[in-house]
């Protein structure tokens, strides 16, 4: 019976490690959603010269909808830079990404279309670099989290035996 308890302790610790490791994917999910938004904005502004509020109304992303980001930016047709700033605060991401999004929002809707397109491109480049950096470290971090949880489970099982 003790061995069964030890085995269950190790397995449950490993499962907890898997769940924690999967939680690390959220950082990458945020960047992917923002990249989709900026790519969509770039395409629609470049090709069709659509106003920003229409772009936000027509864009859909499950993650950005769930955290309330898109609802916030859709809430106003005027003063998008202020609405953008409050929507950016909803994003659970690191300071570097938030600062870049705030800088983008300061000129949102104010710049001429050509300059706005260039600003979107700069932000896309930043997000792509950030995504590459995160995804490169993510696999190793996930593997480490699972290993540490497994070792903790083994240590607990040994102590209990």
Positions of the model-derived regions?
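Acidic, low-complexity proline/glycine-rich segments
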Residues: 1-6, 91-94
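Juxtamembrane/interface alpha-helical elements of multi-pass membrane proteins
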Residues: 5-74
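Non-transmembrane, amphipathic alpha-helical segments
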Residues: 22, 26-29, 93, 108, ...
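Generic structural signal for well-ordered, non-transmembrane alpha-helical segments
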Residues: 32-35, 39, 64, 78, ...
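Membrane-anchoring/interfacial helices and their immediately flanking loops
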Residues: 70-95, 157-160
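Short, non-transmembrane cytosolic segments of multipass membrane proteins
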Residues: 84-114
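Membrane-interface, cytosolic juxtamembrane amphipathic helix immediately N-terminal to a transmembrane helix
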Residues: 109-151
């Amino acid at each position: 019976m003790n061995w069964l308890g030890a085995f269950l302790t190790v397995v449950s610790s490993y499962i907890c490690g898997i769940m924690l490791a999967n939680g690390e994917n959220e950082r990458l999910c945020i960047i992917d959603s923002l990249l989709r938004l900026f790519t969509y904005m770039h395409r629609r502004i470049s090709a069709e010269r659509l106003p920003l509020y229409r772009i936000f109304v027509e864009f859909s992303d499950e993650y950005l909808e769930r955290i309330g980001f898109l609802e916030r930016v859709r809430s106003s047709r005027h003063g998008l830079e202020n609405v953008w700033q409050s929507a950016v605060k909803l994003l659970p991401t690191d300071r570097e990404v938030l600062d870049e999004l705030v800088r983008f929002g300061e000129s949102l809707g104010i710049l001429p279309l050509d300059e706005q397109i260039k600003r979107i491109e700069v932000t896309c480049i930043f997000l792509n670099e950030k995504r590459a950096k995160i995804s490169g470290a993510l696999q190793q971090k996930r593997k480490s989290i699972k290993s540490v949880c497994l070792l903790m489970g083994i240590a607990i099982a040994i102590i209990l035996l």
